[in-house]
From Swiss-Prot:
Organism: Pelobacter propionicus (strain DSM 2379 / NBRC 103807 / OttBd1)
Gene Ontology terms: cellular component: plasma membrane; proton-transporting ATP synthase complex; proton-transporting two-sector ATPase complex, proton-transporting domain
InterPro entries xref list: ATP_synth_csu_bac/chlpt, ATP_synth_F0_csu, ATP_synth_F0_csu_DDCD_BS, ATPase_proteolipid_c-like_dom, F/V-ATP_Csub_sf
Protein name: ATP synthase subunit c 2
Location within or outside the cell: Cell inner membrane
Topological category with respect to the lipid bilayer: Multi-pass membrane protein
Amino acid sequence: MSFFSMCVLGAAIGMAIGTLGTGIGQGLAVKSAVEGVSRNPGASGKIMTTMMIGLAMIESLAIYALVICLIILFANPYKDIALKLAETVAK
């Protein structure tokens, strides 16, 4: 398997793990917020505001995973080293 194939595979696995964690975290946050509003409807404004801030923090994990995956795919700092190594091995 080539270096670039490994980069694509690593980026795909990294993005999958990042979004899986984000989805689970957001689901648990919304579940807790809905339970809190059902117990105390008067505090729904504060609960929803806190939930939205929490969801933004949770979503940042997926954004960071996406940025790292894009760096791996398009701006890989090891690309030149891998190409030189491949040329050396081919000789």
